[in-house]
């Protein structure tokens, strides 16, 4: 094929290649990937909204939501790696290599200072607020107090402000008057857990499975294919550069809603491999890979139940609920450990570098669990004409879909049963003890 004709076909190849990639971007996935109906109507409550409602005899008392920030720009590190790859292509691109030439001509518009919330991310939060208000109108009624907290990261603070703005004048406070409490102790508990930082965050060997997969046959095949498309020796690429090209495809889709020319480098099978690489990192750094990943989140889990307890006590005393709406904005790294602590999305076999094929139908897919704007919502209800035990019930929603409780396989649980199921975590998971560095003969011991 002549170079000119091949270059003309590139847009078509991009469109075809990217059509099936959106579901494989892991933690860089759009929220619409888990709720496709929002692509048509961002305020839709979805086809099964009515089925998730409780009987009229049950009135919501409190909503506690833990959110991931909305769509963000790439990190500074990702932008540096992209600049490195883009620079190589600009230096080496030849007219006879249309894919490389097209990418070399691609405008590198990212800047390291962009490590913040994208405009799309603000809309994510505004629309989420409006949908939650429509789903739970009694809780979001006028003169209801909203307690809004966030991690100290700018993208989270911006997301919190956008969430409040999405509610408009529906609450008693003006859009700019609700203060956002910075609470890194709960939203970035992982930074405050010495054991996690020492044994996982700062320990290269903790990511052994991730690094092994980068050097494994599946990634080698993808790398060689990308190198061939770019007319580069395979030795000039590595797994990190291939991954940043794939992530650029994801960012262009999430931020600009456009199909990036970078997407043309990857087939759906390539995307599955790169998704697994992302999931391996999430699994070993934030999920079930090490107990400390999830146990460090017990401080947040316990706080959720302390607030639910308080609401139950106030209701029993016929007092107004002091905190009917509690919304906290954190990160994928906030939600993933919390869900692992609760036992969700756990596979029978651990994710490892050598079982990619066997994990084709795994539960642990980070893009399905914690995409941009992911949200875990606890709703406490008071139900009339019930026994004392059944008077208070709880519903959990992940990304606006009711979750099944482990102990009942139902989407509604009595509050007493839920507390009983998680009794060990609520009573015996002490953050200071869990996160304390173990010492042997006066020196820190490595437990991993």
UniProtKB/Swiss-Prot annotation:
Residues making up the signal peptide according to the UniProt record: 1-19
Chief localisation class: endoplasmic reticulum
Induction context: Repressed by parathyroid hormone-related protein PTHLH/PTHRP.
Enzyme class: hydrolase
Keyword Endoplasmic reticulum attached: yes
Disulfide bridge positions per record: none
Alphabetic keyword roster: Cell membrane, Endoplasmic reticulum, Glycoprotein, Hydrolase, Membrane, Secreted, Signal
Gene3D superfamilies reported for this sequence: Phosphoglycerate mutase-like
Alphabetized GO MF terms: 3-phytase activity; 4-phytase activity; acid phosphatase activity; bisphosphoglycerate 3-phosphatase activity; inositol bisphosphate phosphatase activity; inositol pentakisphosphate phosphatase activity; inositol phosphate phosphatase activity; inositol trisphosphate phosphatase activity
Location within or outside the cell: Endoplasmic reticulum lumen; Secreted; Cell membrane
pH-activity relationship: Optimum pH is 4.5-7.5.
Annotated Pfam families: His_Phos_2 (PF00328)
Motif (Prevents secretion from ER): 445-448
EC numbers, comma separated: 3.1.3.62, 3.1.3.80
Anything else known: Monogastric animals cannot hydrolyze dietary inositol hexakisphosphate (InsP6) which makes up the bulk of organic phosphates in soybean, grains and other plant seeds which are the primary source of animal feed. The high activity of the chicken protein toward InsP6 offers a genetic strategy for improving InsP6 digestion in poultry and reducing the pollution that results from high phosphate content in manure.
Family (UniProt): Belongs to the histidine acid phosphatase family. MINPP1 subfamily.
Function per UniProt: Multiple inositol polyphosphate phosphatase that hydrolyzes 1D-myo-inositol 1,3,4,5,6-pentakisphosphate (InsP5[2OH]) and 1D-myo-inositol hexakisphosphate (InsP6) to a range of less phosphorylated inositol phosphates. This regulates the availability of these various small molecule second messengers and metal chelators which control many aspects of cell physiology. Has a weak in vitro activity towards 1D-myo-inositol 1,4,5-trisphosphate which is unlikely to be physiologically relevant.
Protein name: Multiple inositol polyphosphate phosphatase 1
Source organism of this protein record: Gallus gallus
């Amino acid at each position: 094929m002549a170079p000119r004709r091949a270059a003309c076909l590139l847009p078509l190849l991009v469109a075809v290649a990217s059509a099936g990639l959106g579901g494989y971007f892991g933690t860089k996935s759009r929220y619409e990937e888990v709720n496709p109906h929002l692509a048509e109507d961002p305020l839709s409550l979805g086809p099964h909204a009515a089925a998730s409602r409780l009987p009229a005899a049950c009135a919501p008392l409190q909503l506690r939501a833990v959110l991931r920030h909305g769509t963000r720009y790439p990190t500074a590190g990702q932008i540096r790696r992209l600049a490195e790859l883009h620079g190589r292509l600009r230096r080496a691109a030849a007219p006879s290599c249309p894919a490389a030439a097209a990418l070399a001509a691609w405008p590198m518009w990212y800047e390291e200072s962009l490590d913040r919330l994208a405009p799309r991310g603000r809309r994510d939060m505004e629309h989420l607020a409006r949908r939650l208000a429509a789903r739970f109108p009694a809780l979001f009624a006028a003169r209801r107090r909203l307690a809004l907290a966030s991690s100290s990261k700018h993208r989270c603070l911006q997301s919190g402000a956008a969430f409040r703005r999405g509610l408009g004048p529906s609450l008693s406070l003006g859009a700019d008057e609700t203060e956002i409490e910075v609470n890194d102790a709960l939203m970035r508990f992982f930074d405050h857990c010495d054991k996690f930082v020492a044994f996982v965050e700062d320990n290269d060997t903790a990511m052994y499975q991730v690094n092994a997969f980068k050097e494994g046959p599946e990634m080698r095949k993808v790398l060689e294919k990308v190198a061939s498309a770019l007319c580069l020796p395979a030795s000039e690429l590595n797994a990190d550069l291939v991954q940043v090209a794939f992530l650029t495809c994801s960012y262009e889709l999430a931020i600009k809603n456009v199909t990036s020319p970078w997407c043309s480098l990857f087939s759906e099978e390539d995307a599955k491999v790169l998704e697994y690489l992302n999931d391996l990192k999430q699994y070993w750094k934030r999920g079930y890979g090490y107990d400390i990943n999830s146990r460090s989140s017990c401080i947040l889990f316990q706080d959720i139940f302390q607030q639910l307890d308080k609401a139950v006590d106030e209701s029993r005393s016929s007092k107004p609920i002091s905190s009917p709406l509690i919304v906290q904005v954190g990160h994928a790294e906030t939600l993933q450990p919390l869900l692992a602590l609760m036992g969700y999305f756990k596979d029978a076999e651990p994710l490892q570098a050598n079982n990619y094929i066997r994990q084709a139908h795994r539960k642990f897919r980070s893009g399905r669990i914690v995409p941009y704007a992911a949200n875990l919502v606890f709703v406490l209800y008071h139900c009339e004409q019930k026994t004392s035990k059944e008077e208070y019930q709880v519903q959990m929603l992940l990304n606006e879909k009711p979750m099944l409780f482990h102990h009942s396989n139902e989407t509604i649980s009595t509050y007493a049963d839920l507390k009983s199921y998680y009794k060990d975590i609520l009573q015996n998971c002490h953050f200071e003890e869990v996160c304390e560095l173990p010492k042997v003969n006066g020196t820190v011991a490595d437990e991993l």
